[in-house]
């Protein structure tokens, strides 16, 4: 069984070497959707009985480790000197998040997966795991990151 829960952020970025308008500073209403797999809790009388995990617990993790980090912030690649200088001109009050990758939807999906995965825990032994993170950049554009199973 799988369940999904999402958070949305208003976040700026740019793709510095892009052939089109994405190379300019701009923003999106991102949706980060966690997909969790596991067994339904069968322990009688517990709060999560009949669930994989309480949706509010997933929301708390997504809010803390994704939303609160990049909402109303500008995500900039550490190698994008122009964008970093532009952000620095706005001073310390500007929310800038410097990352070691170009902030495409694909890379942000992986970043969010890695931020959230350690915090998905199985309280009742139902072996929960984050199987995918979906990053919707626009209503028509969604990237998904899944770890390779070995």
What are these regions (language model features)?
Residues 1-150:
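Charge-rich, low-complexity N-terminal segments
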């Amino acid at each position: 069984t799988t369940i999904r829960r999402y958070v949305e952020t208003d976040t700026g970025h740019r793709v510095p070497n892009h052939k089109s308008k994405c190379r300019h500073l701009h923003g999106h209403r991102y949706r980060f959707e966690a997909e969790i797999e596991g067994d339904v809790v069968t322990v009688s009388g517990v709060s999560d009985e009949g669930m994989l995990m309480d949706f509010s617990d997933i929301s708390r993790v997504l809010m803390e480790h994704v939303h609160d980090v990049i909402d109303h912030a500008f995500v900039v690649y550490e190698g994008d000197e122009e964008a970093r200088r532009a952000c620095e001109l706005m001073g310390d009050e500007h929310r800038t998040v410097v990352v070691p990758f170009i902030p495409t939807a694909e890379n942000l999906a992986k970043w969010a997966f890695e931020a959230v995965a350690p915090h998905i825990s199985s309280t009742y032994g139902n072996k929960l795991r984050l199987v995918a993170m979906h990053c919707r950049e626009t209503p028509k554009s969604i990237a998904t990151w899944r770890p390779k199973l070995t």
